[in-house]
Amino acid sequence: NTIRVVPTPPKTKFSKVWEKNCTDLGLASRNNTGLAIYGQYLAVQEYNGPIYLYDMKTGAAVKTIDAARSFMMKARTDDAGHLITSRENIYGAGFMVFYYSEADQEHKLLLDYTAGDGCPGDLGYNMSVAGDVTSGTAYIYGTGPNDMTIYYWKLQDGQLVTPANQPNKLRYGPAGSSWTAAPAIQRASLADDSDHYISYTKWVNGNSDEALKSRFNIFTTSMEVTALNAAAHEYRLLGFNVFKVENDTYLALNDQGADQWAGGGATLKVFDITNTSKMELGPDDDGYGDFCVFTSDMSAWGQNYFSWGDVAVYKEATSTGYDVYICL
């Protein structure tokens, strides 16, 4: 009998493609609140400013797109690759969501939830989409600070099924009390009984109480919760993105510390959450290295009073597998 030992290459391999700060990118300010990978572009939404497009693979500036309205906050892409941007309800501006039409080179209105119709203040401070907003079933989600409620709308073939002024409301009881910053929310699928991913924080500047630390959870329609061990990340979660590569599911997290000056170093962490039972693992547990497949070097200290941060992911097939680009 012959025994052969065949080495198994790692499932994932990570490398830094480029790194630039706001000055390097030519951004007018540090108030950059939305991030999306839009085709071959990295799209950066400046708060109450334009959308800057960069070459995703080099960081080279390409062009600028005027914002749809004032107080534009977030940038996302839907499942079909459309660029989606949104305005938060500040100064009674209302929560508005648009997609950008390349053909017409203009923003198309998808949702206008006005303050006069009862839109809560600051709703839209965070936003996400699921599906293709122009065809078939899609969803728009909006969240705000100092709340426990997630608001969402269903669309069919680009039209609202849920009236703009009558959003579906999902109260997230497992939070226990109101979050202080608008949570990030992601729908797992378009199925009616889809799970959801959420990260939220109750952090108050100057307070390092462990009970206020950010949490990342998966929850079902019946509010069964699978929680990521909070020891696996820094004090604040700024943003996340859950993505699939064939049959595997990965979680990309942007986290940051929180000192008395609302600052700290930040990292990117990637977890293999295909087997969700591993989410209970902490850094000192056996098997953690196979669960947390990547941790970046910690960034220099940065102040981040509003806990702004985003994670954008783009996947493309290659001759040997997939290249996945993660930007934050």
Please state what every model-predicted region is.
Residues N1-T8:
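C-terminal edge beta-strand
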Residues K11-T23, A61-R69, Q105-G118, L160-A175, ...:
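Beta-propeller fold detector
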Residues L27-A36, A67-A80, S86, A115-V133, ...:
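Repeated scaffold domains used in trafficking and secretory/extracellular systems
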Residues G39-Q40, A80-H82, S135-A138, S194-H196, ...:
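Short coil/turn segments that connect the beta-strands within blades of beta-propeller domains
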Residues G49-L53, Y91-Y99, P145-D157, V204-N217, ...:
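Structural motif
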Residues A232-W301, G309-V311:
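Loop/turn-rich, solvent-exposed surfaces of beta-rich toroidal or solenoidal domains
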